[in-house]
């Protein structure tokens, strides 16, 4: 493998700053007081990012990819007699269904086409008809396409019918403004290597304390027991139950500081949104149309339709990689697409350089 530095135009892992990388040059002990106090500081900062009503929420870390944290929530918060409604319009909603099925959790699905947002009328109809449902889950930014789902409306419906609300905000938290209390979210899940601009290694859950406190003994896994992980962090000053990804944690703290220096989530969202708008404008100029209606498009990642016969993604990928850019293949089943992300340490000038490569004939000639 060539030792090149590529600009990752992906939804995470993503391009990080030099300073985030540099803090990983030092080693940390998982039992060290200074390290555990750093964990506590990060937990506090995340709650502050998530809501103004900080006293009602807490943060739990979970080792592994973001999916580990999703599975931790699904497997730990739904009781044996519970039933989950999942709103799906992409691979990550489907993954929640798969997790629930694997864990033998009773699950029902509200399916929408991958290029359309959650169907609120159908969600309400299901909630009206099925009183056994106890929990409802939705993906905020479904990076299968880049679509933003109406989490405020989904959670409002959930609470209207007395359900516990779960939001997979893996690819939106830190890059899209939100307040979990205002949105009536009970459990929100995200990851270190997304909009906060850290590196892979752990995910985190912003949880409403009163809901999390009810989850003792519900977990269907030892290592993914969300309640036990939280209780240990609370009672032992930030200690993880099992070996934590120390370098990733330290890098994440640096990334949080840099988010603050940038001007917070609002400023980062402005940069991401500008990146995305410039990307679409420039790509249209060279013959590529976006998949989604602008009203549903996130500022995180954009799906583009294949321009015509003879186009192959692999050629696009390899030739862009030779010029220092890494993009994503498509992930939907019914339409040929590829995806370009614009989060991470990425700026408008990078977007122009990318599309300049395409317009100069590097990719499609």
UniProtKB/Swiss-Prot annotation:
Its EC number is 2.6.1.37. The modification N6-(pyridoxal phosphate)lysine is found at residue 194. Signal peptide: none annotated. Gene3D superfamilies: Aspartate Aminotransferase, domain 1, Type I PLP-dependent aspartate aminotransferase-like (Major domain). It catalyses: (2-aminoethyl)phosphonate + pyruvate = phosphonoacetaldehyde + L-alanine. One of its GO terms (molecular function) is 2-aminoethylphosphonate-pyruvate transaminase activity. InterPro entries: Aminotrans_V_dom, NH2EtPonate_pyrv_transaminase, PyrdxlP-dep_Trfase, PyrdxlP-dep_Trfase_major, PyrdxlP-dep_Trfase_small, SP_NH2Trfase/AEP_transaminase. Its cofactor is pyridoxal 5'-phosphate. It is an enzyme of class 2 (transferase). Involved in phosphonate degradation. Homodimer. NCBIfam families: PhnW-AepZ (TIGR03301), PRK13479.1 (NF010006), transamin_PhnW (TIGR02326). PANTHER family: 2-AMINOETHYLPHOSPHONATE--PYRUVATE TRANSAMINASE. This is 2-aminoethylphosphonate--pyruvate transaminase. It comes from Bacillus cytotoxicus (strain DSM 22905 / CIP 110041 / 391-98 / NVH 391-98). The gene is phnW.
